[in-house]
Amino acid sequence: MGENEDEKQTQAGQLFENFVQASTCKGTLQAFNILTRQLDLDPLDHRNFYSKLKSKVTTWKAKALWYKLDKRGSHKEYKRGRSCMNTKCLIIGGGPCGLRTAIELAYLGAKVVVVEKRDTFSRNNVLHLWPFTIHDLRGLGAKKFYGKFCAGSIDHISIRQLQLILFKVALILGVEIHVNVEFVKVLEPPEDQENQKIGWRAEFLPVDHSLSEFEFDVIIGADGRRNTLEGFRRKEFRGKLAIAITANFINRNSTAEAKVEEISGVAFIFNQKFFQDLKKETGIDLENIVYYKDCTHYFVMTAKRQSLLDKGVIINDYTDTETLLRAENVNQDNLLSYAREAADFATNYQLPSLDFAMNHYGQPDVAMFDFTSMYASENAALVRERQSHLLLVALVGDSLLEPFWPMGTGCARGFLAAFDTAWMVKSWDQGTSPLELLAERESLYRLLPQTTPENINKNFEQYTLDPATRYPNLNSNNIKPNQVKHLYITKELHQYPLERLGSVRRSVGLSRRESDVRPSKLLTWCQQQTEGYQHVNVTDLTTSWRSGLALCAIIHRFRPDLINFDSLNEDHAVENNQLAFDVAEREFGIAPVITGKEMASAQEPDKLSMVMYLSKFYELFRGTPLRPVDSWRKNYEENADLGLAKSSIPHHYLNLTFPRKRTPRVDSRTEENDMNKRRRKGFNNLHEPSAFSSQSLGSNQEGIKEGGNQNKVKSMASQLLAKFEESSRNPSILRQEHRVSGIGKPILRSSSDPPVNSRCPKPEEPTPSPSPPLKRQFPSVVVTGHVLRELKQVSAGGECPARPWRARAKSDLQLGGPENLASLPPTCPGALALSGVLRRLQQVEEKVLQKRAQNLANREFHKKNIKEKAAHLASMFGHGDFPQNKLLSKSLSHTHPPSSPSCLPSPDSAATSSPSTVDSVSPARKLTVGKVSSGIGAAAEVLVNLYLNDHRPKTQATSPDLESVRKTFPLNVGGSDTCYFCKKRVYVMERLSAEGRFFHRECFRCSVCATTLHLATYAFDVDEGKFFCKPHFIHCKTNSQQRKRRAELKQQKEEEGMWKEQEAARRDPPSESSCAAAAIATPEGSPPDEPTSPKKPKSIPEPEPGDVAGGAASPLPSEWTAVRISPGEDVVGQDVLAVRVLVTSDDSSSDAELDRGDSEASSVEPFDERPQQPELQLPPLLKPFTRHSSLREALPRAVSPHDLGEPEAEPALQRANSFQCPTPSEYQSGRRFQSNFMPVNSKMTVSPPKQACPPPPSPSPPSSSSIGDLNALDSPSLPQVTVSNTASQISRGHCSPSTPIFLRRAKAHGPPKDLPLRLPRGQVLERTEYCLVRPGGNGLQSSRPPSPTEMASDGCQEAVAPPRDIRSIHRGPHPVEGKDRCLPDHPLSPWAGEEPGEGSTRPRRVEDGGLELAEEKSGLKKLVLTPEQKTWLLDWNDSNLENLYLETGARLSQKSTRNGSGGHVLKPVHPLLLPLAEKETLPAQRQSQEKMGAPAERAPGERSMAPPKSPLRLIANAIRRSLEPLLPNSDSGRKAWAKPESKTLPTSPPHAYTCSFSFRKSSSSKDSDQPSPKRDVASKASAFFSLGSPTARTAQPSAPSPPAPALCTHSLPSRSSKVFPALVPPPCGKMEDVPTLLEKVSLQETVPDASRVPKKRTSLFSSFRLKDKSFESSLQESGPRKDSQDLFSSPKGKVQPMGNAQPPEKQGQPISSTCLGQRVHPVSPEKDASPTHVPIRAQGTGTVSSTSSSTTSSADEEFHPQPSSRSKERKALRRRRKLEKATKQLVKQEELKRLHKAQAIQRQLEEVEEQQRAFEIQGVRLEKALRGEAADSGTQDEAQLLQEWLKLVLEKNKLMRYESELLIM
């Protein structure tokens, strides 16, 4: 036996020796296989293979190797092979770096597989080894495998030998190596993970290789410089041309060969004579040569191009290196002789024979290649996630960082990268989060290119995997996790545009080239980019940029779509510069550091400012030029194709600089192009020479000079206009330009027509545009008014783009007095607007002249030009105009009556609304109105408003073109070097700019709370020139505007009266002030109260209807509308809605609808027609309007003509109603907040407001101001929109009552008559919802209705006797659609009569969310939100979306009406108001109804908001769903509910009330048009509402009332019609008539226990409030248990089996507390379930519990199937309590997470601020030195200072990007 053992050991030792000595790849594998077979080892058992091999091979040689390998493996990082036992790694490439990585991973215990596509190691190239590399290889036993390894002074090794050493070590350590296997690509885990849980795999060639089934967690690319794994971008480092030749000659190892000296890689430096002699003797000119002796004689030489050409190696000379060195251009024989000759000379002809070694292709091993450019990957690693499987992807070796061959960096840095990668895998296995992992890896990777043998640790013994042992000055937190988010790639990325963009943005500071920017380099780059542009000659960084053309050229070069360069005029420096500044700021986030005016006026623009500014363009664009795709913003409109465009600009991280830069552009580009074409046409072919010179200029000089002047003026006007258009790229403006002004191709054509009038084609003339925009076709009278007014008020001509109009403008004016004007066709307003532009130009030039005159340095040059311009303009306008102009500019700067809420999108208007001063208004109006004031129509009013508000002349401090709607730079602002706040000097480095103001960072504070502001998060009040933090903006704005305007109200009212009189004859309602009355609508996307500052239009895909009625004019209001409801002489039934809606829609609305609207619009007739309309006929105009207001209706509107009419009417009515407010300027107050008033709009159900309340500035200032504020927050929760009074109140801060027209008329005419059948569904009811229905009565309700005065005093809005037969309103037998809620004498429901400021808002939109929503809303109002939550909601666009959506969803759900038997509407008595006390607790809520009714009690600060969707909802949902199947009678119940409800109420005392609730699916059919993200938000919002609002709120008398029969109808959305097939059809007679029914389910419930209601209700409220509060924190009040009881069950409640639902007559029992309570519970869970059903709250009727999608009711049944069984109730109660507890905890956790995130971001912001401060201090010091202001400035080198300063600038730019990323988070 002993002999056998010895033999085995001897044999093992021999086999192992064979393995160690193997000299080829194949030989090594063969020896290894024999060894493992003989020793009975399993190489696949990687964990035990090495230990078993070690135990079986015990020879002394082997032991020496084991010792070395064990020593290496004893490092603590490896944990004896247990660090990465769960990790499987695939390494692509068997080169030195791939194998070195495999060895490290094997030491860590990972399963490692290496694939190598070759089976030979034939690379003879010799590597220079750094000392640490030699030490490392020795530690792996290199000397044991290759005895000559680094013998003596040798510090190099051939790649082949190195590969063999590492190959053998890897095999010994259990690495699985496959040769002749080629990696193709990574395969993602399949989607079907349930059946087969397959992770990441790879595709290989051959396809059937066993590795195809191998799943791995880590993949490492080590396959050379030409290959990188997908997802890594590469950067190129270019040097001067370098052509290398490598040659390998056979080494026969003779004595002669051994004597030859090697030549090191630094020969060139020390031996110049050698190269000179070589050239002289052989003609070979080399830059360098290296000779290493190894297995071959290895030569590497760097040859000069000319030498290669001279020797015939390169056949033809080409500038392109690739072409130069391609095989066809190289003579191979000459190359071989060239290499041999050089080698001979280099070795002094001592090598006896120079025979070429053969490469792996069997050819002489000589190669010539270009290493002019080297590549490096931008990132070292990334993480992919698919189907919950994570994959770590990394690069090592040349794939990661290509080396510079003479320095030996390839192997050295390759090994360092291998260690770093193994360290990362170790962290990965230990569960480090992906972002932290990537951040650390990137931090290390930044160090890698900087490593040299000198700057790494010299103590090689200490080297381990831990990077700290290798890099002396390691900062592994250099890169922050948030900077590497783009390296964490998930499938869902494309759904999140922000993340998507982040992913294509280079991480801040990862570029290692930023430090090499020098002023000279910057100049060169600028010269390259501006080459070929006319009039652009960049010779320096100062004077060359004065004209502004160079800046425009750079922008045009990369984004030609942004600037029409051809239209720019070299003489208009101010305009050009400002245009460039504005475009750069808006599109790229590059804030200006100087104004356009300063640029032009300075003899030499400030060099430092220019260097700083241009460096930002350089950083942004220095990569490959951007494709001229439309800006990334389109991504937000879900234009998927642009995703590609985005990824094509990977490094331009400025793209996202501030969220506010993202404005939806929709399809503006085509329009823009059209306009540019038009502009060019007008410019190049001045079509109307005679007309222009005679009429336009008002002088008959026909000379050439005059022609030149014409050109000049036209070009000036056109540029001004162009800039205006370009910078106000707002889509709706474009639409207005095209449609309102009637500008379009037709007009261009007509420009050549001789007659003056032909230029303004009449409406009936066919227009070429496919669908004549209805906006173009205003009745002529209207236009006349518009024209007249506009003459004085237009500024900047935002509405009149086409150039030919400039020519016509004057001629049109010269048509004469009002008589002619009155006869002008509708399109003339464009011309007149242009005249305004020209005048404005003149003013601008005058001011510029004055300013420039002060500048001595420029006086000589500029004065002359300006005089010319001024003189020319003067001659053009005639001196007669001057006084008016002056007056105009004065009055306009103060004047601007309100514009309709969503009036004009110009961000400027939205952002800026100056206080209107009435006195100035009057003169202007007097000047303009003149004789035709009586001819002014609604459209004119709107337009006037638009012009007053949105195009009023900007105070001049910037260029005239600054009318670019971007910002106004007031004259008093000071220069760019003066701080706007502290008035001290602000140096370039410390200069920030916003709204055209320049200031210090530390001075940029909220003027209320002095909080430091950031450029991405501030609000600006243009009127006062103050900056605010977003939360304070609304309050300040509202209050200040109230103060300012109180004095004006009277005069404005008088004016309005005057206008009303003028228009009374035409039946046009009061003034357009009412237009504006629509409360402030904001851009849906913007955070609720974020100011819509011009810079911050949010990129919201589509402004929604909400905008209009909503409230603040949004910066992007999609439409502006004027609705006039004539006060009416006609009876209720007649012309109820004689409304005209003037709409300018923007592209964001669906085109289909637009077209439909347009075609309908053509039929619109002048307003005075149809004095009496028996039916409510909505002018087709309304269609587009509805398009917005009910754009999101769930079902297509086109279902039937009726449908078309209806929706149109509704919004119109709403708007009309809201527009009734007399005080025009009030809206302005809200103009700025991006409150979510928008929701208000969509279906502003105009609730009957108090008829006669005068508009007091604010009934209760606190409530008004806060209400506005609150509204902003919770409009989402109020889809009921604040309309009529509320609308005005809330938005404007004071309530100006207005009654729905039909109500008003009804009042006027006594008992109402039947309403026309076509009244919009929901509209009337919405207004009448608060009305009581007395089953048998005919007139008004018997109980005494409060008089208007009383109402006013109550602050409650009440329904004025509405028309009787409400059923007719529902156009169909099914009252289901209606919305009336009948209330008992005592105010019943919260919304019944809420304080004007708030309550009204609820009812209005009842239709929207249905009562439920409404009620919820009211309930929500009671929600007490913590400040953090408020801010949270404010800050995230989500909340807006939620509002929006909520609102839309609500809007969608048309309330179903249940009318009592008589169907007569009774007037409610004292509608109740819910107090909104901010911290009201349970007891407070239980207060008597009287208290609830107190209008003033509503706490100003309180507004409910939609909290973010939290997991608790989801859980609740799931629970709820799980209960559904268990419910016994759900089917029968459903059927019961489904059956049509009785149309009459059971006869009962007047206080019987009906409640109808309907919650519509937010994501209904029409929603599909909307972007899905919004839908989600909608669901969130709706879910939240449902959760938060007590159901019982709905119709409970606030004071105990005697039990009364009540019919509660509950319309709940069904999750899908499939679920309740029975529910849908029966109630609706005609499906088409009630599209919403398709999405709604109407359920009837009776309420048995009315007596309990009041009590229940208060507890419900409190519980809800508590519940919501718990959303914020958790129930803090003492009664949670009790509440939860109320909420989730009421033991006493008796629910009758559904099947037994009693007929309505029998249902007159008191409401059972059960129902109320029950309903509530379901709400929470269900609401989360899906966007569709928001609702549920139970209006429980004893018989049935209504459920949306059966969940609620079924749940109720489940919990109380047998009212008698208390035990079941208890169980249910316990369950609910448990659920409630769990939800509370979840909510808390959610809150904590948000808090932590906020704190982390805050900390990072503070750090950034500190760093910026440090940079600023240093920058100011340098700037002073550069400007000669420092004491020692003369002694310092300016170039060096400038270089240093520029470096600081770049660093600061990085910080600012980082800061903006943080703010975006």
UniProtKB/Swiss-Prot annotation:
Per the Swiss-Prot or TrEMBL record, what residue ranges does the short sequence motif Nuclear localization signal cover? 660-681
- State the top-level EC class: oxidoreductase
Q: What is its main location?
A: nucleus
Question: Looking at the record, which segments are called Monooxygenase domain?
Answer: 2-494
Per UniProt, the ranges with Polar residues bias are: 691-710, 1215-1245, 1277-1298
Q: Which residues form a coiled coil?
A: none
Task: Identify the residues that bind Zn(2+) 2.
Answer: C1006, C1009, C1029, H1032
What ranges does the record give for the region Disordered, renumbered to this chain? 660-710, 726-777, 888-922, 1040-1115, 1144-1298, 1334-1409, 1478-1612, 1669-1782
EC no. given is 1.14.13.225
A single Gene Ontology CC term: nucleus
Q: Where in the cell is it found?
A: Nucleus; Cytoplasm
Give any single GO term for biological process: actin filament depolymerization
The source's domain of life comes to Eukaryota
Which cysteines does the record link by disulfide bonds? none
Q: Where is the composition biased (Basic residues)?
A: 1768-1779
Family as reported in the entry's similarity comment = Belongs to the Mical family.
Name of the protein in question: [F-actin]-monooxygenase MICAL2
Species whose genome carries this gene: Bos taurus
What gene is this protein a product of? MICAL2
